Amino acid sequence: MGFNVVVFLSCLLLLPPVTFGSNMERTTLVIDGSRRIAETDENFICATLDWWPPEKCNYDQCPWGYASLINLNLASPLLAKAIQAFRTLRIRIGGSLQDQVIYDVGDLKTPCTQFKKTDDGLFGFSEGCLYMKRWDEVNHFFNATGAIVTFGLNALHGRNKLNGTAWGGDWDHTNTQDFMNYTVSKGYAIDSWEFGNELSGSGIWASVSVELYGKDLIVLKNVIKNVYKNSRTKPLVVAPGGFFEEQWYSELLRLSGPGVLDVLTHHIYNLGPGNDPKLVNKILDPNYLSGISELFANVNQTIQEHGPWAAAWVGEAGGAFNSGGRQVSETFINSFWYLDQLGISSKHNTKVYCRQALVGGFYGLLEKETFVPNPDYYSALLWHRLMGKGILGVQTTASEYLRAYVHCSKRRAGITILLINLSKHTTFTVAVSNGVKVVLQAESMKRKSFLETIKSKVSWVGNKASDGYLNREEYHLSPKDGDLRSKIMLLNGKPLVPTATGDIPKLEPVRHGVKSPVYINPLSISFIVLPTFDAPACS
């Protein structure tokens, strides 16, 4: 008996420390497990690979290096392991320069050369080339790492510039068709083909009218049917990969019609420019973060009213545009924005969310030279492993600084709760209720023996559990040394860094008595897994 008490007391050292001197606020989450309010794709988490060459610069900084599809070091063991850790990570190949990429296959009318800086090119660059030798290398890498590939096609090929940003003329699909034929002949698996990048509406540097775009999607669909006529499965058609304008998007669905466009994609950079001095303030402002909800609701409504056959994806989202915010996007603080937006978007039936970028800029999930994961990488990996497809409704008595999102757990019973504490001074003690009874209590309500009390508070690391009390898993995320701009994230107090053998570290929870309270420290993030929560919608 005495020995057991000593063991329990020793294990108390594993508990995430409650921040002393902070305010304490008790709150209850009321979770409706009877129905799903929305649903994501099985592979909701996605990351992009861009085309930017090393000469891409913003604000006198050039943060891309060798991070493009054309020059990325595919021989890096850590890069491969970072993707393999997801088992099935969707990778969207695309970006600003995709509508200037020529595929070096078939009968080309002009030489296929690499991107060069030029004053008269879109985004300050000439056309670029994807050589088939490189395409072979990329596909061997994707096959070895289990990646699910979405490829962004050049939608300006054959067109001519009219005036301003407008481009006209028919899309020349021959280069795309030759490229697809080569891809199929090699047996390379492409899950989906995306048409164009940021050409919708008024565009960024270039735009195509919705009338032309709708017509071209029908052409693309027929090209895919022809190229894949002997294939058991056919890739999805994805478009337009632009910034949402309700009228333009609605018209695109109407003009292309049922059975053509499978996925409607839009881009988000709601934090503004990467050099905004108020970037951190925006990330920590719950009202600012919530402002994006209307956009997701409008996209969802547009699909329901004008194209219920299509799914909504976020095709590209980096938080801050122009390569992200230096010493912000690659640090712990960015996970407040990133995870919160994953939560908001999923509540509005967003099926896939592609983060800009896997590598490159300041917003890369991986450091561009070493491929060492940045904090958002681990946030994405935890979401991918823990958060299932089904989203449940949740109400809370807490202030707006405590963000709560609830999903069915992934490939297991019960639910997973994502809690984000944006408060600088308040520790939240969280109880959970299914609307009928309190499942987790914010404080102990009945007298227990000393040993029972210790057992309900203690936390275990790994799979160890002494009895039925110990069946709640917690993943508490915080920055190293309390520095929100640290590039090192702590999981339950332990630094998340590659192992001595160059592997992605294990993401192990602490386990608590299911009836003990959940503590969420100021400026921290937690995933809470409740395998015994009764949620019929998750069956």
UniProtKB/Swiss-Prot annotation:
GO terms for cellular component: extracellular region; lysosomal membrane. It comes from the Eukaryota. Keywords: Glycoprotein, Hydrolase, Lysosome, Membrane, Secreted, Signal. Glycans are attached at N143, N163, N181, N300, N421. Its EC number is 3.2.-.-. The keyword Hydrolase applies. It is an enzyme of class 3 (hydrolase). The active site is at E198, E316. It is found in: Lysosome membrane; Secreted. Disulfide bonds: none annotated. Belongs to the glycosyl hydrolase 79 family. This is Heparanase-like protein 2. It comes from Arabidopsis thaliana (Mouse-ear cress).
